[in-house]
A protein has these predicted regions:
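Short linear sequence motifs
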Residues: 42-45, 67, 134, 161-164, ...
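Mid-to-C-terminal catalytic subdomains of enzymes
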Residues: 1, 6-24, 63-161
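N-terminal glycine-rich phosphate-binding loop for ADP-containing cofactors
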Residues: 49-53, 146
Length: 182
């Protein structure tokens, strides 16, 4: 049982819902690292974002999250579970809200405000705990990794200053290429 979908459905991705993004801002925060700094022949991700372009250089980030991020998040979990030969179930995977999220509340410091309200209705005498982000041990795991060595990567790429999650992305890409020996 996984609950990744609750962040998507109920507004727990407050860092991605923090503002009405321009195209460039959203691409930068979503991609987090520029492939041109690490790959010899990077492929532009621009066409993926272009499908969500709005007037005045804005992006329909809510639709992007619903279409792209949702698939990305669920398939990552589904793959891990299938490799471990375990059943995968996320009760929120197909859940859609009848009304749009109140972005002002989320931006005002109330991520998952609907869940909190339902909790308070069901358990009126209990205090609502603060949201605690899922711990990410990648900084520790990837601390000593020296970086990719395949020819597809720019060898002068210095990964020492990168956060663990970005090292992990490079590591996974290199492992993928090793598996299929492209």
């Amino acid at each position: 049982l996984v609950g990744e979908g609750s962040d998507i459905v109920f507004g727990g991705l407050d860092w991605l819902l923090a503002k009405d993004w321009t195209m460039e801002e959203f691409e930068k925060i979503y991609i987090s690292m520029d492939p041109e700094n690490f790959l010899r022949n990077p492929v532009s991700l621009q066409p993926i974002f272009e499908r969500y372009r709005l007037p005045n250089n804005r992006i329909d980030y809510l639709r992007f999250l619903d279409d792209i991020f949702r698939i990305e998040a669920y398939t990552a979990y589904e793959n891990a579970f299938s490799v471990a030969e375990m059943p995968y179930f996320d009760p929120f995977e197909r859940l859609k809200m009848a009304t749009p999220l109140d972005l002002n509340r989320i931006r005002g410091g109330e991520p998952k405000y609907i869940v909190r309200e339902l909790f308070k209705m069901r358990y009126p005498n209990c205090s609502i705990p603060c949201k605690i982000r899922m711990p990410n041990p990648l900084d520790c795991y990837m601390r000593d990794w020296k970086g990719p060595s395949r020819r597809e990567f720019i060898l002068k790429s210095d990964v020492r200053g990168l956060k663990g999650k970005w090292k992990w992305q490079l590591y996974c890409l290199e492992r993928f290429l090793n598996l299929y020996d492209f």
